Amino acid sequence: MDIRDYPAIDVHAHYGDYHRDGCSDLQNQMASGDAGTVVARARRANTQWTVVSPLSGLMPRGRADAAAGNLEAARIVPETEGLLQWVIIDPGREETYQQAEQMLGEPFCMGIKLHPEEHCYPITEHGDALFAFAAERRAVVLVHSGDENSLPEDFLPFAERYPETRVILAHLGNGGGAAGDPTTQVRAIQASTKGNLYVDT
């Protein structure tokens, strides 16, 4: 059987309106798509399940409402065949911890999404609280990685300290601003001793 005959699972996707300051309207439009659009694109690529977080909970940078985004996703995802949810935790929004506590018990929620860049915090300062929370719930954690607040090597101590978590470093090859050193995620995984650090493409 050809590998292309197997349905895929996309563990890192978003739905909603993309807005990056400094991007053209066309770039923002091309990166946008409602839940139905995301599923339609996935189907064309033989992707059976797509795990999403809402862009409204991440963007615009430093101004997104993660709590409102989580509520939106908890409504939209169960109604959209082919989608599953990451619940977003923003350490600056205490209510997102409470939402995660509740949503992690739902069959459509696969784990926790962290985005230190969009929520403007260094993972080195907030990682212990975030990963202790995740470890207590044995949660999978998808993290943006490769930029100033989210260097892959900065996640390694938390993955080591909290082996109950499974941590996915997003953006294989992102060494900063979608450029830089393309080996940073791989080197962090090579240094891991607990076998709980992964990467997505």
Residue ranges and their predicted role:
Residues 1-129, 133, 137, 191-194, ...:
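Mid-domain alpha/beta scaffold segments of enzyme catalytic cores
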Residues 110, 121-201:
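Catalytic pocket-lining loop regions of alpha/beta-barrel enzymes
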